Amino acid sequence: MCYAGHQFGNWAGQLGDGRAINLFEVEHNSKNWKVQLKGAGETPYSRNADGLAVLRSSIREYLCSEAMFHLGVPTTRALSLSLTGDQVIRDVLYDGNPALEKGAIVSRVAPSFLRFGNYEIFAARNDLKNLKILVDYTIKYHFPNIDSSSKEGYINFFKYVSNRTLEMIIHWQRVGFVHGVMNTDNMSILGLTIDYGPYGWLEDFNFGWTPNTTDNQNKRYRYGNQPNIGLWNLHQLANALYPLIEEAKPLEDILNQYKVDFKIKSLQMMQSKLGLFTNDDDDLNLIQQLEDNLHLEETDMTIFFRLLSDFTDLPSSLEIMSAAVYKSNNIPKDFKKKWGNWFSLYSKRLLK
């Protein structure tokens, strides 16, 4: 499945096929599943690369994709992990010191592995015939409620993709997952988390954190910027689909709606994390103060929200913060005051 894409905000042209080999398709529980191998060797578009994978990165993909599924995050899934018996040379730290590692193959499954880049490549080549064939195929097998024989159908297709992309990213923000390399060739057309490369999980709550060392300078794919990048990538997909629609406004309306929906869904997600099951006019302020406070000192995101479920009264808030803050023996007074104010607001909000 040849694709192109935008990498770190720049058009990179044809990229390859992700070292992936599609084996077959099966039907299970009235759903179609594609079975794919990653790391099995050269592929039609692997160019000069060996197409191999190593055990280290394969274990990361296997474990994380399954963890994400059980955390309720839309994702591709891992079926199996196998050693190949080969030794594969890789420069792990990109510092000019390559070393041999154990080779491995991951078998993964998903309803589809189509990416934004699969559509971009045909648009870039002005190959509208194959672009239309691919879009019609995608609609027929993955969005069957859409009529693909009209421009309105293509507009609805883009709307579905936008909604699913936003849903996926909201889940990422919920669990503190940072993809690390949100290029358009790594964006699933079905809104599934795909390509577990330099991903990571937040430890301390930090909107500016990225696990990708090659992105350390600009931090384009940092945690707090993932929703914006999702929108940017959708702009590129809209550009690719435009020749089939020939109207900019419907696409622009969908992109603008993404911004509106993000604010709504982000609020709902944070309300859920805080155990707030009704709406209140002050919830946005409560959440903003919480996020500001979480940045005051290195505070473990997972530990904080886990212990917050045990919150009963103001005295218990000190125990929560002592356990969640990394340097709990050296907490400034201003820090305690701000958290005390927040827990007071939170306590009153729980009673509403």
Where are these regions (language model features)?
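Conserved helix-loop functional segments at active or binding sites
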Residues: K140, P144-S148, E167, H171-R174, ...
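Short acidic-aromatic active-site loops that bind/stabilize oxyanions
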Residues: L128, D147-S162, P227
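Catalytic activation segment of kinase domains across protein kinase-like and atypical kinase folds
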Residues: L93-G96, L100, R174-H179, N183-P243
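Secondary-structure transition/capping motifs at alpha-helix termini
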Residues: N29, H70-T76, N145, H171-M182, ...
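Beta-strand segments within the central parallel beta-sheet cores of soluble alpha/beta enzyme folds
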Residues: A78-L83, N183-N186, E252-N256
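Regulatory N- and C-terminal appendages and interdomain linkers associated
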Residues: M1-C2, N216-K352
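Conserved ATP-binding subdomain of kinase catalytic cores across diverse folds
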Residues: M1-K151, L190-I194, Y221, N233-L234, ...
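Phosphate/ATP-binding catalytic cores across multiple sugar-kinase/actin-like superfamilies
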Residues: V161-W172, M269
